[in-house]
C-alpha cells in the first residue's frame, strides 16, 4: 500500500473512531489502540509533510457537536495534549521546551492526574456562571449550561473577591468510582443496560437533553486551566492559579503538586501509578505542565496542543485481542465459570491469555462469539475481563458460545436456581473438579495452611483416586505420597509433618476450611467468636445466625443447609476422629470495657508489621466486628499499603480511615 493510501486509511479510521468516542459516546477501540494509530499518522506526516492536509485528525481535536444542543464558540481554542509513553519521551519533552526557550530553562513543573472524563469550559461573568460548553472540536462545542448547573460541586456564583470580570475556567467532568458502581447497580436492578466505564457514564450523563436526568447522576468536576481572563489578573504560576480558583469555590484535584525537576516529575508519576487503584476516580496518566505562565506564553502552541504541557500516559489497561475459545471451569461450590481463551496480549503490565466471562447472562449481554475481536481490560489486581466486542471486525466463521447443560467434569446435569446468575453442578464431592477445588481450599494458607500440599499435588491425589474427602488427607503416609510426580521421600515426609501440624488449628480456620458458601475469613471468625463452639454453630437456628455480624439471610441459609447435609456431618466427624482440634474460645468478660465494642471495621491493603489474621483476632478481642467489605455501616477502615477499591469506597462514604501505625497504637493501648 502506498504512503498516500496508508494515510487516507489512517485518517478514515481515526475520524470514524473519534466520532464514535466524542459524539456517540460509544467507542469501539481502547484508548491505547487509538493512540497508536494517531502516533503512526503523526510519524508518517512528519516524514512526509507534503501529504499533510488541513482535514487531518492531527490538526484538530475531538469530534463534531451534537445536533441536539446549541453550539458555543471557544474564543480561545480548547486544545488536546501531546502524549509521552515512556521516560525517554518525557526527557525529549523537557529538551524541546528548553531548546525553544534558549535563555531560560524550566525549573518548576505543575503535575496532576489525567482524569478520564469530559473536558468542559465554564464562563463566569461578574462572578456568575453564564455558560458551560464541551470541548467539541476545539473551536466549537455544545452548550451544556443547564446540565452543568446540576453538578453540585460547580459554583453558580464565585466566592470571595478579586476574580476577573470575565473568567473562563476549564476542567474535567467525571464520575467517581463509587458513584459509577452505584449507578450501574441501580441500572441492573431496573433491567437496564449498565455503562461500560465511568468515562462513558460521565459523558452520557452530561449530554442528556433533559437536565433532570443529569441531576440524578453522581458527577463531579476538577478545574485544570483557565481560558479567557478579562477585567482582572491571575497569578503567574499555574499551580497558584489552582489555589486562586479553589479560593473562589472551584474544586481542585488534591493530588496536584509542584515538581522542581524532571526527576521529581518521574517520582510523582510512579507514585500516582502505584496508587491509581486507590484513587476515587479513573485516571489514565498524569499531566505535566510548565508552571510559569510567562514561559507558557513564550512556548506557545502547535496546531492541536500546547508546547508547554504533555500527558504522560500509564501502560494501557485495555487492549484489543481475539477470543479463540471458551473453557467452562467447575469451582469448589459447583459454580460453572466460562473462561475466555485469548490470543496472548500485553495489557496492564502483564501478558494476558485468559479472562473471565462470569456467567451465561454476561455472555448474552456482550453478544460475544468465538473468533470475535474483543476489548480486554486488566486494572490492578482485578481478574482480566472482556468489556466489549468490536462487532465490525466479526469474521464470517465466528461461532456462537453454547453454554453447557451437563457438567464438563462429571457429566451431571447442571442447575440454575431461580434468582441466581450462576449455573451449578450439584454433584458435590462426587464431581472430581469440585473435589479438587474443595481440597485445595481446605489446605490453603487461610484455612488449615498445609505447607507443601500445593494445587498440583492435590490434583494428582484426586486423579489417582488416593483422596476423596478432607479426612483422607490425614491417612496419607510418606511412602504412599512418593508415588506422585516430583515427590521424593524428604518432600513426602515434609507433607506428612505439615498435615500433623495442621491438626492443631482454630475454630474460625476450621469453619473457613469447610468451604461453606459465602462464609469467608471474616464471617468464619465472627461465627466462632459469637457461638464459641462448633456444636453451637451447627445447631443454631436461622434467627440465631442472623444475629451474627456479616451474616444475612442468604449466608444463614447456606450455613443451615451445609450443617443439615449428612455427608458434611460425616466429613466433620471423620476430621475430628483423625485428630483435628482447636482450643476453646473464652467468652468475653462483659464487665471489662471493650474500646471497639460493636464497631464494624474492615482491613484492606498490605500490612507490614502485623499479620492480617493476627490483626483480625486482636480487633475482635477488643469487641470489633470485622467485616469483609465497606458499606454505610462501616465505622473504621484500617488501610495498609496499596489499598484499592475499599479505600476509595470508604472515602466516598465518609468512613473513618486509619493506617497501620494507628491500628498498632489502638491494639497496644
UniProtKB/Swiss-Prot annotation:
Does the entry feature the keyword NAD, yes or no? yes
Binding residues for Zn(2+), per the UniProt record?
A: 407, 410, 425, 431
Listed binding positions for NAD(+) are: 31-35, 80-81, 112, 135, 172, 289, 313
Q: Which UniProt keywords apply?
A: DNA damage, DNA repair, DNA replication, Ligase, Magnesium, Manganese, Metal-binding, NAD, Zinc
Q: Which residues form the active site?
A: 114 (n6-amp-lysine intermediate)
Q: Which organism is it from?
A: Aliivibrio salmonicida (strain LFI1238)
* The name this protein goes by in its record: DNA ligase
> Which HAMAP family does this entry report, sorted A to Z?
DNA_ligase_A (MF_01588)
Name the cofactor(s): Mg(2+); Mn(2+)
- What GO biological process terms are annotated to this protein in UniProt? DNA repair; DNA replication
**Cellular component, GO annotation:** cytosol
Please tell me which top-level EC class this enzyme sits in.
ligase
Ranges of residues in domain BRCT: 591-669
User: Which GO molecular function annotation, any one, does this entry have?
Assistant: DNA ligase (NAD+) activity
Catalytic reactions on record: NAD(+) + (deoxyribonucleotide)n-3'-hydroxyl + 5'-phospho-(deoxyribonucleotide)m = (deoxyribonucleotide)n+m + AMP + beta-nicotinamide D-nucleotide
General function of this protein: DNA ligase that catalyzes the formation of phosphodiester linkages between 5'-phosphoryl and 3'-hydroxyl groups in double-stranded DNA using NAD as a coenzyme and as the energy source for the reaction. It is essential for DNA replication and repair of damaged DNA.
| Record's keyword annotation contains Ribosomal protein | no
Q: Name the domain of life.
A: Bacteria
What family is this protein classified in?
Answer: Belongs to the NAD-dependent DNA ligase family. LigA subfamily.
- The UniProt record lists the EC number as 6.5.1.2
